[in-house]
């Protein structure tokens, strides 16, 4: 360490170019140069470019070693294979041409000799194996999807080929034969386009399965959706509910009339009234019903003779109830509860 002390002289060029570790490890100097006032240490921002340049030089050196390695073309080939998975055909073609060029360069590098860095050799082999396994993982779902579509196409083809006895198939085949004979007699070549084939396939499938589809549609249309009733039907039920709020229990005749006017069945009407009574109806106590039927004049009697007022109130209630036919506005049920 003492031999490096002269490098720390402030007036020496070597002192400015010496590493930072030397200046930190040797705070004192035995140089014979004249003493100068101690200057402030250089800011960290001034040292960053040197560190960055050193890091860049080290990175460039590692890249150069990797690119000059004999396994570098194989590494690029594995990377290109990963990029080819799921790529469009034109991109795959360009990548394949690039891979061919890399193969020719790989032969030249192999003839030049092997690398002398075992650690770098292990790194290259490990990274190549990792890329190969990654390509296999990428390829597996694509292969499964391709196999699925092939199976579906085979099933559709079997559907079209098995329909030799159907009327639609015979008519289409007859038309094709007749059309082919006319074109052959005219000396014109037969022209088939993908769009025409698709239309023919659609018409063929419709002719074969139209009966099944129509029956299925009728079956689905019969099943009514669960949930809210039609708006008009609910309005009619609510109107009846408002008229018979004191006792909202329709009779069988009224249920039949509601079913005819709303277009609902008896089960739907029963369920609607059950839910409506559970949510929006509270039975009124009988005492309150009688009190509501009592005339206003009967309430003025009081205080002097309780018995007289009671008898008078009772007679008033009876008189008030006379002539009422309980068509839903009374306190008693009209129909079956």
From Swiss-Prot:
What is this protein identified as?
A: Homeobox protein knotted-1-like 4
Output the Pfam families linked to this UniProt entry.
Answer: ELK, Homeobox_KN, KNOX1, KNOX2
Recorded GO CC terms: nucleus
Q: Which GO terms describe its molecular function?
A: DNA binding; DNA-binding transcription factor activity, RNA polymerase II-specific
The record's region (Disordered) falls at 1-56, 159-190
Source organism of this protein record:
Oryza sativa subsp. japonica (Rice)
Where's it mainly located? nucleus
Q: What is the lineage of its organism?
A: Eukaryota, Viridiplantae, Streptophyta, Embryophyta, Tracheophyta
Which key words are in the record?
A: DNA-binding, Homeobox, Nucleus
Q: Identify the gene encoding this protein.
A: OSH10
- Which PROSITE patterns does this one have? ELK, HOMEOBOX_1, HOMEOBOX_2
Q: So what family is this one in?
A: Belongs to the TALE/KNOX homeobox family.
């Amino acid at each position: 360490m003492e031999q490096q002390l002269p490098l720390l002289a402030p007036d020496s060029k070597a002192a400015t170019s010496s590493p930072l570790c030397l200046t930190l490890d040797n705070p004192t100097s035995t140089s014979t140069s004249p003493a100068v006032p101690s200057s402030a240490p250089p800011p960290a921002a001034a040292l960053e470019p040197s560190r960055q340049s050193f890091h860049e030089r080290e990175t460039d050196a590692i890249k150069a070693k990797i690119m000059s390695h004999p396994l570098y073309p194989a590494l690029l080939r594995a990377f290109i294979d990963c990029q080819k998975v799921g790529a469009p055909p034109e991109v795959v073609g360009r990548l394949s041409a690039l891979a061919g060029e890399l193969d020719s360069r790989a032969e030249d590098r192999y003839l030049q000799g092997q690398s002398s860095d075992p650690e770098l050799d292990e790194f290259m082999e490990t990274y190549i194996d990792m890329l190969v396994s990654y390509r296999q993982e990428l390829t597996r779902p694509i292969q499964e999807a391709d196999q699925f579509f092939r199976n579906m196409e085979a099933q559709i083809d079997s559907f079209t080929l098995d329909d030799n006895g159907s009327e639609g198939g015979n008519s289409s085949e007859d038309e094709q034969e007749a059309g082919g004979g006319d074109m052959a007699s005219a000396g014109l070549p037969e022209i088939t386009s993908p769009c025409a084939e698709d239309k023919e396939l659609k018409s063929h499938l419709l002719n074969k399965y139209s009966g099944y589809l129509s029956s299925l549609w009728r079956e689905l249309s019969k099943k009514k959706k669960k949930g809210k009733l039609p708006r008009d039907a609910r309005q009619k039920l609510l109107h009846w509910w408002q008229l018979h709020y004191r006792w909202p229990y329709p009779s069988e005749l009224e249920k039949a009339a509601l079913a005819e006017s709303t277009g609902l069945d008896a089960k739907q009407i029963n369920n609607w009234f059950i839910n409506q009574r559970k949510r929006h109806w509270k039975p009124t106590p009988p005492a309150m019903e009688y009190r509501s039927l009592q005339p206003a004049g009967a309430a003025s009697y009081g205080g002097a003779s309780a018995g007289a007022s009671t008898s008078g109130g009772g007679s008033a209630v009876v008189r008030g109830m006379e002539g009422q036919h309980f068509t839903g506005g009374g306190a008693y049920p009209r129909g079956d509860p």
